[in-house]
Amino acid sequence: MTAPGFVEFPDSPFHLYQPYPPAGDQPGAIDALTEGVSDGLMFQTLLGVTGSGKTYTMANMIARLGRPALVLAPNKTLAAQLYAEMREFFPRNAVEYFVSYYDYYQPEAYVPTRDLFIEKDSSINEHIEQMRLSATKSLLERRDTVIVGTVSCIYGIGNPGDYHAMVLILRTGDRISRREVLARLVAMQYTRNDADFTRGVFRVRCETIDIFPAESPELALRLTLFDDEIESLELFDPLTGRVRQKLPRFTVYPGSHYVTPRETVLRAIETIKEELRERLAQLIADGKLVEAQRLEQRTRFDLEMLQELGFCKGIENYSRHLSGAAPGEPPPTLIDYLPADALMFIDESHVTIGQLGGMYRGDRSRKETLVQYGFRLPSALDNRPLRLEEFEARMRQCVFVSATPAAYEQEHADNVVEQVVRPTGLVDPIVEVRPAHTQVDDLLGEIHKRAALQERVLVTTLTKRMAEDLTDFLSEHGVRVRYLHSDIDTVERVEIIRDLRLGVFDVLVGINLLREGLDIPEVSLVAILDADKEGFLRSERSLIQTIGRAARNLNGRAILYADRITDSMRRAIDETERRRAKQIQHNTDHGITARGVSKAVRELIDGVVAPAGHDALESAVPAEVLTDEKAMAREIRRLEKLMMDHARNLEFEQAAAARDALNALKSRLLLDGVGWSG
């Protein structure tokens, strides 16, 4: 086997880290898809089974073709997983993350039946906002960029032309006055704060201006002027003040995607006034005097804010005026920042394509009510996500990636490439059908067998009530079980999955487990209760996806509890058998012995999901601490303080990671018999 290392391709700016050479169906899939892109095919499908290394195939394609890429995932959890993997494959290149930056979002809405107006309320995740700004900066600055995102990328952000026009390029030796630098920074939506130096802030001390770029995770810029000339540019650590690097040139990007040049704002104010006059005349003619008065009051306040500050609360509702677009034209989105020759990958496309089509309709109905009752001008309807046909018109050369492609992919794909044989030699699980009338007792017996072997079990039911009852029943019979449902947020869901992998409990019960993008090599049994109840949760696609959750384990098995075999079951079983036969044949022909997947329980993404606290003695505690009693005591105190600090700052994921490291260290103390008193 070839040693791990970096691989470069001719005319490609990417440095691909290959932990292992492509194997199984990967080499053929990479060649076929790369050739398809080179031949100009617009749409291709990678039909890749669970655990076949689809992300690795994508990374190899990107590196070979040497083009910027956008990878879309159906949810934040999967996007974080893909982002972590892409960072491993491209540690020397720009791998960026673009998802919704709202931790909490209550959109502006009006309920006519109760005469209730709900103000927009939101909580923005600072870290994700920084990553979004970093993503657009990378797209504008460099070719070796991979962006991992969700459907958030079809929502309007600032016009790329305006955004690019507002950048501040600084070079040593350039003549520029202090007043001009400060005015430019304010126009770019940076705020002056000489006391609290954080992202999107600048501070001034005589001829020195410190700027903390909005897209920078940790370094700030120090600009020193002498007699209206830039004397030096230095990157420094805002925490310690230590200079890291002297620079001949630096580009400061705007503090927000919605930044707009002054002349554009002034032009927009005039067109907003014109639209307001027309709309007021229409409302008054219709006898809607309350609505007219409400609209005039709200819009005039926004116009005053735009005149004085250049922005206002809810500025996105005036995006059509600011971008100069015609009524009905789609808003600028992340897709507009992509170069024309970029690649697109739509992961789990059978889910993601449906999301792309559904976003527009829900947004439209809410906004129409706001416009009808005088809360917004009609132009607010153009601040919206793209419609599916608009997204299609902006798509670059695209690869749909799914184990179960839906009708859309089948209609559009010019080329379908199968990736069925796994690099590890693992084969699809054995599928059994057992009677439904004894399903709970039979399942209990199977769980005890798996738990004895330190293996995990996934159980999928049809209803929330049944999942709760089953969880109670299993718990009463001594099974360590948890229940995963839609009310659990993203972070807690990741923690539950992590605890399952670590053996904190043995059985996870859920209703629609397949949508979680579960990647759990420890799961050796998937049990599907009431598999013969035809419908969305028991369709062919759902069954194949759920069966695939056991495909990463050497002893993988799926049990379908049913009293009859439905058409969906038959097709799912036949497809699994077809893949299994192909995999076994490949292993036989090449003398491959299947080996299980051992995958570290790792952090997904800083600031999105907790850094791994498990295996914490290796990851969070220096090795020398483990051999020194005093150092261990100091480390425990440090971790306790860190945990409390994170909790005070409401950073619960990091607090949980510190707690895990603390527990691991205390366990080591107990095991080694070292006494310690706090």
UniProtKB/Swiss-Prot annotation:
Main location: cytoplasm
Domain of life: Bacteria
Domain UVR as annotated: residue spans: 633-668
Coiled coil: none
An annotated GO BP: nucleotide-excision repair
InterPro entries linked: Helicase/UvrB_N, Helicase_ATP-bd, Helicase_C-like, P-loop_NTPase, UVR_dom, UVR_dom_sf, UvrB, UvrB_inter
CDD domains: DEXHc_UvrB, SF2_C_UvrB
Helicase C-terminal domain location: 439-605
Motif window: Beta-hairpin: 101-124
Cellular component, GO, one term: excinuclease repair complex
Keyword tRNA processing: no
Record's keyword terms, sorted: ATP-binding, Cytoplasm, DNA damage, DNA excision, DNA repair, Excision nuclease, Nucleotide-binding, SOS response
GO MF annotation terms: ATP binding; ATP hydrolysis activity; DNA binding; excinuclease ABC activity
Subcellular location: Cytoplasm
Function noted in UniProt: The UvrABC repair system catalyzes the recognition and processing of DNA lesions. A damage recognition complex composed of 2 UvrA and 2 UvrB subunits scans DNA for abnormalities. Upon binding of the UvrA(2)B(2) complex to a putative damaged site, the DNA wraps around one UvrB monomer. DNA wrap is dependent on ATP binding by UvrB and probably causes local melting of the DNA helix, facilitating insertion of UvrB beta-hairpin between the DNA strands. Then UvrB probes one DNA strand for the presence of a lesion.
Comment block on domains: The beta-hairpin motif is involved in DNA binding.
Family to which the UniProt record says this protein belongs: Belongs to the UvrB family.
Protein name according to UniProt: UvrABC system protein B
Origin species: Bordetella pertussis (strain Tohama I / ATCC BAA-589 / NCTC 13251)
Lineage, broadest ranks: Bacteria, Pseudomonadati, Pseudomonadota, Betaproteobacteria, Burkholderiales
Gene: uvrB
